[in-house]
């Protein structure tokens, strides 16, 4: 093959969670991914890198459970399940001549990012107040992800990886920072916290904003520094 490595990031995400979409999610995120990996192996590609997601561990939690090496994936929706099944299909193809890298990043942010980050940015630019809830999230800046992937290829790695930024993020502090960069002022308040705490676990939107979802920092360490931006 003329290719040393394939980085597979294509897939369906941030689309409707309507049950009617389930078959399409599995077809694209699982079946086509495994099909591409099989072709890569057949054609002599040495390394296949698959972009999975922290979502394989389920949604955010009210309590501060930390994902460790022993944490068993328990996806709560067909997006997470399709990613996890794709992982298993790729792992089954691994051999001495065909290395597989599974990357489970947390929420990725940066210019042009999709998903929850743009929603938070929109909130930061429009609302005068925001709930100051004490939560923690693992996040990954796009430049740090790119450097991590570069090292995966350069070092001809194989295995399961969990890259993240050096520090966890508190949603309210992130929203306040975004507002500041856009020269907006937003005040953090706690009078809404009792309502938020009741809603965590009951509302997917509230879970994503104010729930806890973090990797053990030791899980994300690598022999070379990839966390080049704070």
Task: Label each region the model flagged.
Residues 18, 122-140, 144, 148-151, ...:
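A conserved pocket-lining segment of Rossmann-fold NAD(P)-dependent short-chain dehydrogenase/reductase
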Residues 148-207:
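Mid/C-terminal beta-alpha module of Rossmann-like enzyme folds, strongest
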Residues 27, 62-108, 129:
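Catalytic helix-loop patch of NAD(P)-dependent Rossmann-fold dehydrogenases
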């Amino acid at each position: 093959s003329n290719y040393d490595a394939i980085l597979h990031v294509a897939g369906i995400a941030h689309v409707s969670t309507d049950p009617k979409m389930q078959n399409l999610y599995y077809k694209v995120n699982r079946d086509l991914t495994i099909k591409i990996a099989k072709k890569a192996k057949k054609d002599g590609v040495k390394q296949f890198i698959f972009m999975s997601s922290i979502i394989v561990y389920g949604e955010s939690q009210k309590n501060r459970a930390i994902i460790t090496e022993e944490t068993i994936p328990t996806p709560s929706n067909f997006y997470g399940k399709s990613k996890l099944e794709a992982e298993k299909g790729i792992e089954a193809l691994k051999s001495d001549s065909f290395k597989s890298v599974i990357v489970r990043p947390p929420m990725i942010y940066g210019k042009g990012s999709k998903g929850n980050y743009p929603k938070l940015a929109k909130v930061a630019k429009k609302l005068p107040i925001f709930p100051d809830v004490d939560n923690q999230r693992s996040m990954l800046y796009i430049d740090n992800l790119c450097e991590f992937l570069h090292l995966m290829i350069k070092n001809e790695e194989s295995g399961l990886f969990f890259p993240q930024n050096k520090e966890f993020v508190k949603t309210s502090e992130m929203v306040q920072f975004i507002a500041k960069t856009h020269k907006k002022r937003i005040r953090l308040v706690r009078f809404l916290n009792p309502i938020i705490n009741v809603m965590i676990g009951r509302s997917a939107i509230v879970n994503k904003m104010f729930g806890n979802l973090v990797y053990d920092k030791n899980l994300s360490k690598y022999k070379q520094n990839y966390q080049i931006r704070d």
